[in-house]
Amino acid sequence: MNDRIISFDRHIMDEQRRYGGRGDFSSILSQIIFAAKVVAAQVAHAGIVEDILGNVGRTNVQGEEVQKLDVYANKLFINALNYIGKVCVMASEEEKDMIMIPAEYPKGDYVVMFDPLDGSTNIDVDVSIGTIFGIFHRITPGGDGTLEDCLQPGRKLFGAGYIIYSSSTILVYSTGHGVNGFSLDPSVGEFVLSHPNITMPKRGKIYSANEGNYPYWKQGTREYIEYLKSERNTRKGPYTSRYIGSLVADFHRNLLKGGIF
């Protein structure tokens, strides 16, 4: 029996002390984790509870069919984050406009961007799906967040990560000081450190691409994919194609095993 289990709460508190944080970022992550636990529970019942499956008959801003669980997860993450006083504005793949914090709640110093349920069209066929999130410091002085706060480049991210809902539910995140993964232990309802200090192998053997888009690729992209398939590449043998159609699942595999997305 392992008595050295490190919970996410302990890990984030250790990190907070190490870098002198105030706890605001920790509070945001805690709420993301709460929402993820609820989503994980709903996904686990997707084949049993009929009103979870299927689409709602409209498309999102990306032109994708909106699934019922998309709508549920989107509202869940918004409601988990909008009242805690640590966030000034949010943006979601499921929303056309910025998500403002209600007037009755205090505004914080962080901006949260998320895709509540990536790969949701895979729900009906029991394929891995996930949540993607990124967190920025606001750049405006205070009050309601603005479009300027939202449209920051990726290099300005304060922290980012994803949750994959699969045979197990795993959270992977980084603040620029290493990458750590936590698995949800259903027996206690807590995320525990399962993948400490993740490093991607220097050389993998997998590439992940939707080759149905081949006719629309630029010539350089086509040539690169053909290079990976050939024996002329640095592996001296063809790469293996693995494409699930859920970014979180494809990226997670390639992060752990090595590969190209």
Predicted regions and their residues:
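Short beta-strand-loop/turn "lid" adjacent to the catalytic site in phosphate-handling enzymes
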Residues: 53-68
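IMPase-like, lithium-sensitive Mg2+-dependent phosphomonoesterase catalytic core
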Residues: 1-48, 58-59, 71-261
